[in-house]
Amino acid sequence: MTKARCNPLWQPIPCPLSDIEGLESWLGDMAAQGLVPVTIGQNFARFRCSQPKAVRYRLNAKPAPETFLESAPGTPDGEERALAQECGWYYVTAVGDFFLYACEDSDAPELNTDPQVQALSLRYAKRQVFAPAGLLAYWLVTFWVRYAMGVWHTPVIDFVELGWLSFCYLGLLAAALVSVVHNTVLLYRFSARLTRGAEPERHKNWRKGAGRYLVGRVLAALLFVLTIVWTFAGSAMEKSRHGSIPLEDYTAPLPFATLDDYAGQPTALDADAAPAASFVLVQRLPLAPTFIKYEAHGQAGANGLRGALYVEYYECITPQLAQTMYREGKTNGLHNFPETAADAANGSIYCRTLVDGNKVLRVLLFQYQEEQIPLQELEAICKSGFAASGESA
């Protein structure tokens, strides 16, 4: 053992904590290299240096709490420790829902001599490892119920507009599901082996699959950090309208009717509106390679159109996705737009969702002038340049 390695060090755990046989075998191999565990967390274990020696490690399931409101003990009680010491074993540390014991005497009996009794002791650990699965299932059902009841109005539109961040959320959900299923299968398979009366595998090849497991954990951690950073950065960019162009500076043609088109003449943008309130934002999204967000506040002449126009235009990757977004927009037209519906008390709201192939157009127009544009004229203007079908949302 070199001097550089004599300080306490951390090592990544190469298998899930629910892989009892793999974890016990790995700790035994580390002891053979002169590394004795001090504490074991979810992903890393802390070791201290010692002389290389043969050490057996065994994980004992924590006793189940007496009531639902109580938690499992953090350390074994005196009676359990005394019984272990009589057999030549000593307590090391807690590992999740287990207590870790070690024995340096090769002639000492096993800590657990009856596999079926050991299987019964795993009941609490099995409930604990299954708890995240139940929580995930609860949230998935909750989201589905919210969508079915109309509480979550536009999940597909939200998913498209979030861009790559949506796939980060999906990746985290998939990683959580895989982890929960993997841990549950490992522990239940181990319990079934003990129930049959078979002895645990004392020298399991933990190296098989260790690289794949560690790479998966690293990727999941990186994805989690990326999602957190991206979420906060995206929220800040949305508030600052990062990448948007003031409407007066935007000269490229737009594939939909603008505020000038509805007014029938050039409009003077409202200088009293929030800074950069009138803007155009063009983005490339994974599911909508062309996404244009348009917002304009203004008035045309003394008696012309006075109001605000909000437009979202998508060119989706498939017509099927466009149809789904169209159905959501048709049913929930006012959602996902600025919350200015209260101002309609002094005017009127025109809301429209159109679809044409892989293109979707969502329009929200507020009018506040005394002589308002008739609905038929609004319909004709909205459809101009956009050959679409659909009904007003």
Regions found by a protein language model. Give the residues of each.
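Extended, hydrophilic extramembrane loops/domains of integral membrane proteins
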Residues: C87-T113
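N-terminal extramembrane/targeting module of integral membrane proteins
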Residues: M1-P63
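A short, solvent-exposed beta-edge/loop patch
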Residues: N336-A393
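Cytosolic-side membrane-insertion boundary helix
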Residues: C103-W139, F143, S166
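Short, solvent-exposed recognition patches
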Residues: L247-Y350, D356
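Canonical alpha-helical transmembrane segments of integral membrane proteins
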Residues: V129-A148, L173-A176, A221-V229
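Internal/C-terminal transmembrane anchor helices
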Residues: H203-K239
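Membrane-embedded alpha-helical segments of integral membrane proteins
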Residues: T142, I157-R196
